[in-house]
Curated annotation (Swiss-Prot):
PANTHER family: UPF0398 PROTEIN SPR0331 (PTHR38440:SF1), UPF0398 PROTEIN YPSA (PTHR38440). This is UPF0398 protein SH1465. Pfam families: YpsA (PF06908). HAMAP family: UPF0398. It comes from the Bacteria. Gene3D superfamilies: 3.40.50.450. The lineage of its organism: Bacteria, Bacillati, Bacillota, Bacilli, Bacillales. Belongs to the UPF0398 family.
């Protein structure tokens, strides 16, 4: 397994509006934990579409991991040109900083936004060009990843593609363990 697509909720879908929110710390720690497992299995590339939330936090984790794993690569495959144009200035600056660190950048559609079909085609592109997806999504809290999950399940049923769908129970267990370990270190 050489290439993984990581996706999930957008930050506002998790009611996270600041990068210094404690939830971001725990989500990034969880993403790092997951990626380290796959690095041990030969992971070389992490791909994202460049969406706010899980995807950009994943990019930040990959950039940090490169200190210890310099062969790890980050690819950003956007649906179309200018996908950040409606974002506020702070989010655009964050994206641009991450984009400068990417090893590969490309858009599936070499046009501006034309319609929702661009997102669907980009999702399909990601499935066709990766070995696995890590999807942070829970059926209990619907959000934008539900559309991708449907496509992912259909794709898995037709191919030998693999995925790791992370529900809130797994996240909560990880966070509880992490907090317990932190509490133990203070005793």
């Amino acid at each position: 397994m050489k290439t993984v697509y990581v996706t999930g909720y957008k930050s506002f879908e998790l009611n996270i509006f600041k990068d210094d929110a404690p939830e971001v710390y725990y989500l990034k720690a969880f993403i790092k934990h997951k990626l380290l497992q796959y690095i041990d299995e030969g992971l070389e590339w992490v791909l994202i579409q460049g969406q706010l939330g899980i995807e950009l936090w994943t990019a930040e984790v990959v950039i940090d991991l490169r200190v210890e794993y310099p062969d790890l690569k980050l690819g950003i495959i956007t649906p179309f040109y200018g996908h950040t144009s409606k974002w506020n200035e702070q989010n655009q600056m964050k994206y641009n900083k991450i984009a400068q660190e990417a090893d590969f950048m490309e858009s599936v559609h070499h046009t501006e936004y034309e319609g929702p079909f661009q997102f669907k085609q980009t999702d399909q592109f990601m499935l066709d060009h990766t070995d696995m997806t890590i999807l942070i999504y829970d059926e209990e809290q619907e959000g934008s990843p539900k559309f991708f999950k449907r496509m992912l399940v259909d794709f898995i049923n037709k191919t030998n593609y693999t995925c790791d769908i992370v529900a809130f129970d797994e996240l909560t267990d990880f966070i509880n363990d992490m907090q317990w370990e932190q509490d133990q270190s203070f005793e």
